[in-house]
Amino acid sequence: MEQIKRKYDKILVVNLEVNMKKKIIGVTPRINKTDSATFVRVHRNYIDKLTKLDLVPIIITPGSDLNTVLPLCDGFLIIGGDDYDPVMYNENNDQNESKEINPDMDKLDTDILNYATKNKIPVMGICRGHQAMSACFGKALYQDIESNHLEHPHDGIYHEVTKVNNFGLGKELPDKFITNTYHHQATKDLPDGFVVLYKNHDVIEAIEHETLPIIATQWHPERMDTKESDIIFNYFEKLIMNNSK
């Protein structure tokens, strides 16, 4: 029995050593509350895209010991989810345009971005994660695309995006291509240092930082099995692999 235990311990240590050689990606979740329970979830599409690249995702939840967890991560993925509290960018929600606000998630995203920018850790933002690049730094969002009369034509859940800057990720993607549409809010103002890569008429659809390893898309590339989606996630992996943490 003791021999079996020693063998098991050895296997466990070897597995841990192998896994620690892989790059770890901290992933934010969605929080869903019912009358009887709170659910923390991440859609499998996000996980599948990361593991396909041999990256190791770990879910970071509100209340986590960030001083312990964040230094473990070689990159961060801020996923889609609820709307940010407009108080973050000095606006109110009198018209109830921002929905299902979760202050705990707002704080978590802000803490992660502050850590990542300070330590130059790669970040990819998707949908809400794209809007995080503004809201978490006090820059405004359009709380509702329709009520702000933004031109944002789409056919069902799909629309076309057009390149406006041939920078970074933009150099690897075509001038125009079709993406999905699952959002009712959009970026209004960006912090200094961000370059707009793609737009759909009035709506900013993809951005990248000039000097920090940060990219973000308003659409959901993890939900699309296209060459463009593969390029985006491969580019994120390249940012991670090239980063000297």
Explain the meaning of each model-derived region.
Residues 125, 129, 134:
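Gly/Ala-rich beta-loop-alpha elbow adjacent to hydrolase catalytic centers
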